Regions:
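Conserved phosphate-binding/catalytic region of the ribokinase-like
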Residues: 1-4, 156, 211-310
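Glycine-rich phosphate/adenosyl-contacting loop at the front of the ribokinase-like
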Residues: 1-74
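Conserved N-terminal subdomain of the carbohydrate kinase-like
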Residues: 16, 46-136, 310
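Active-site metal-binding loops of divalent metal-dependent hydrolases
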Residues: 12, 168, 266
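Conserved phosphate/ATP/ADP-binding segment of small-molecule kinases
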Residues: 160, 172-246
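Short beta-strands and strand-loop turn motifs
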Residues: 131-138, 164-171, 196-200
Length: 310
């Protein structure tokens, strides 16, 4: 059996986490979390998981690459730019556990992956992939000219028989205006096959509406499979054939929930680990819930490998 190829497009940043006088360093990024959790759950004989971004030539970038390779995430499509560095963010946690995030990413390498001399040949490769996955953040960090190139890539991939998967992860501070975001999302959703939505992000971007209207709007853009993630509640899957599935979440005692940072990213990973290897939507959603419910029982976005559900 020929293994299929999935490219996950986005940005991973250096994470500094401060609690009191202690400062710990790690790496974080919504799409990177998803890539790692898919790679952990699908054998390479079935699916190759590639990460697509740009990094620097510094020691932090090299450390990232090594960490991802150890997770069986392929890094051969990642560009290293001489004069750029990864973005950086700091998480400050107060005495009540409330977290504040500070970002330094305006000139991060990931913003320029479509501007390099290699970008054209890279896009030609990606256009032949079976699946391309990206999030609202993957789009938000790009300059306008790069967004045009990204759209062209998504359209070409679909024209070649590939599928596009989009997570609506909306961060208002990364965009110039709501109008700009709405237009960008319209463009992306018009060439998306599977969309992961959270109602909080939808409400923030389009205004509060019932689920039925959210689904109707997304369908009108041309999306055939819509997955609505609802945290600790059941998720809703709206299939291309008009079927709707309401799949219960895994219930956890409150004291077991430690860190929900990567809950949505890991849900998407579990869902796709099943869906992209031939499983049905209900099995995929069940796996998504199982993955997310495991991840939130640990601190940090990437849990120990041995803690993964079987």
């Amino acid at each position: 059996m020929n293994s299929k190829n999935l490219a996950v497009i986005g940005e991973c940043m250096i994470e500094l986490s401060q609690k009191g006088a202690d400062l710990s360093r790690g790496f974080g990024g919504d799409t990177l979390n998803t890539a790692v959790y898919i790679a952990r759950q699908v054998p390479q004989q079935e699916l190759n998981v590639h990460y697509v971004t740009a990094l620097g030539t510094d020691s932090f970038s090299r450390e990232m690459l090594q960490a991802w390779q150890q997770e069986q995430v392929k890094t051969d499509l990642i560009q290293q730019l001489d004069n750029k560095l990864p973005g950086l963010y700091v998480i400050e946690t107060d005495d009540t556990g409330e977290r504040t995030f500070y970002y330094w990413r305006n000139d991060a390498a990931a913003r320029y992956w479509l501007d390099s001399p290699q970008a054209e040949s890279l896009c030609a490769q990606l256009a032949r992939f079976d699946y391309l996955y990206l999030s609202g953040i993957s789009v938000a960090i790009l300059p306008p000219a790069s967004r045009v190139k990204l759209l062209a890539l998504l359209r070409q991939c679909r024209a070649n028989g590939g599928k596009v998967i989009f997570d609506n992860n909306y961060r208002p501070r990364l965009w110039q205006s709501q109008d700009e975001t709405q237009q960008a999302y319209r463009d992306i959703l018009s060439c998306t096959d599977i969309a992961f939505l959270t109602l909080d992000d939808e409400d923030l971007l389009w205004g509060k509406q019932p689920v039925e209207q959210v689904v109707s709007r997304t369908r009108d853009f041309g999306v055939s499979e819509i997955v609505i993630k609802r945290g600790a509640d059941s998720c809703l899957v709206f299939s291309a054939d008009g079927e709707t599935e309401d799949v219960p979440a895994v219930k956890l005692p409150k004291e077991k929930v430690i860190d929900t940072t990567a809950a949505g990213d890991s849900f998407s990973a579990g869902y796709l680990a099943v869906r992209l290897t031939g499983g049905n939507a209900v099995s995929a959603a069940q796996r998504g819930h199982l993955t997310a419910s495991t991840v939130i029982q640990y601190r940090g976005t990437i849990i120990p490998r041995e803690a993964m559900p079987q």
